[in-house]
């Protein structure tokens, strides 16, 4: 299993915790990682990626590119540290907890989960909360989050 973390910013990241979160989700969901690249970037880079690949001209918390289907996972995901910071303030969760949540969310996308409908978002949110608890990261109130 290859999990590579890439930080394109100057902000220090809890790399061991992030890798642990990726491994936890894969293990609990029955996934096997062939190769996962996690790229942590700033808002400008994320906006460019979001515009180029998805046609959305704004920053977002994560963009995921699965290169396989099913439980054998190969792919990459990008996480905007700027958006993580804004969400941490918005949801009163703290930066590290929000970073772990978005990382977990990204891995769930690589495993085929979607969040296009309220039901799908709710299912993903429950899984995120569960994995955050297992990691000892706590869970902020999900009331406002359910609107997103």
Curated annotation (Swiss-Prot):
It is found in: Cytoplasm. Belongs to the endoribonuclease YbeY family. Its cofactor is Zn(2+). This is Endoribonuclease YbeY. Its EC number is 3.1.-.-. Binds 1 zinc ion. It holds the Pfam family YbeY. GO terms for molecular function: metalloendopeptidase activity; RNA endonuclease activity; zinc ion binding. The keyword Flavoprotein does not apply. Single strand-specific metallo-endoribonuclease involved in late-stage 70S ribosome quality control and in maturation of the 3' terminus of the 16S rRNA. It comes from the Bacteria. Keywords: Cytoplasm, Endonuclease, Hydrolase, Metal-binding, Nuclease, Ribosome biogenesis, rRNA processing, Zinc. Zn(2+) binds at residues 105, 109, 115. GO terms for biological process: rRNA processing. GO terms for cellular component: cytoplasm. The keyword Hydrolase applies.
């Amino acid at each position: 299993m290859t999990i590579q973390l890439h930080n394109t910013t100057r902000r220090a990241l809890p790399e061991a915790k992030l890798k642990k979160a990726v491994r936890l989700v894969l293990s609990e969901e029955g996934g096997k990682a062939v190769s996962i690249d996690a790229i942590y970037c700033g808002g400008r880079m994320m906006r460019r990626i979001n515009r180029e690949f998805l046609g959305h001209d704004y920053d977002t918390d994560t963009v995921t590119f699965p290169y396989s289907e099913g439980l054998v996972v190969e792919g990459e995901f990008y996480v905007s540290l700027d958006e993580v910071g804004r969400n941490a303030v918005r949801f009163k969760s703290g930066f590290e907890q929000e970073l772990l949540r978005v990382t977990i969310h990204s891995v769930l996308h690589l495993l085929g989960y979607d969040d296009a409908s309220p039901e799908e978002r709710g299912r993903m949110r429950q899984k995120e909360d569960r994995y955050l608890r297992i990691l000892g990261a706590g869970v902020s109130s999900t009331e406002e989050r359910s609107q997103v």
